[in-house]
Amino acid sequence: MCLTIKDLALCGVQNPPPFEKGGRKLLFFPNNTSGGRPMNLVTEHLTIRELRMEDLEQFDRLGNSDFVLQYLCMFKMDREGSRNYLQQMIANQKDFAIASKEDDRLIGKIHIDKDHLRYDVNSIDLAYWLGEEYTRKGYMTEALTAFIDYLFSVKHYDSISAQVLAPNIASQALLRKLGFRQEGYLHRALRYNDVVYDNVLFSLQRDEVAPL
């Protein structure tokens, strides 16, 4: 039986049975591994997929909320700005929707990019957000558990980095729960709305994580 994302991708399993990890039941349907096929990871409650223009209404509403913006250090956009930004993210293929499996409604987003803290190593930088009404339900833990396994097992990264604003205690706790280690503390990392913030630096190494 194929259980890991890597095995499922190789074996082409379409309807794998659920299995338990840390008391949480997970399901994986990795339609994307290579060759340009759309990415589609399905967990117990969520789908992690490529962004679409159909996500505009939810992206504009959630992504412009004070709750999300306060830790992204970004500014509100009008509807046309949100549309252009969404189009840009779709084209760049570095951003993925966290969607409700029940109705495919976007509830958050995952972003990956080059790890600028490291040089000439197989590492990726991870960022994420979730709409306020979807927090405290375990959704981000569920989404990142699947996505991290995808990055290690399918994309074969050796290291994942994440930077979190010092006031964002909940995000730091989430990363630690997922096995990330704090590697550093960057004082006076950025200025947002005339406030200077520090960044907390985290990383997770593939050889420290047991595959799902």
PLM regions and their residue ranges:
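Hydrophobic residues within membrane-embedded alpha helices
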Residues: L3, L10-G12, H156, L165
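Acyl-donor (CoA/ACP) binding surface of acyl/acetyltransferases
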Residues: N31-F67, D95, A99-L212
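Short loop/turn motifs at secondary-structure junctions and domain boundaries
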Residues: Q87-N92, F180
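Glycine-biased, low-complexity coil/linker segments
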Residues: E20-G22
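Conserved GNAT-fold acetyl-CoA-binding loop/helix
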Residues: F67-Q87
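Cationic, low-complexity basic patches in intrinsically disordered or flexible, solvent-exposed regions
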Residues: L26
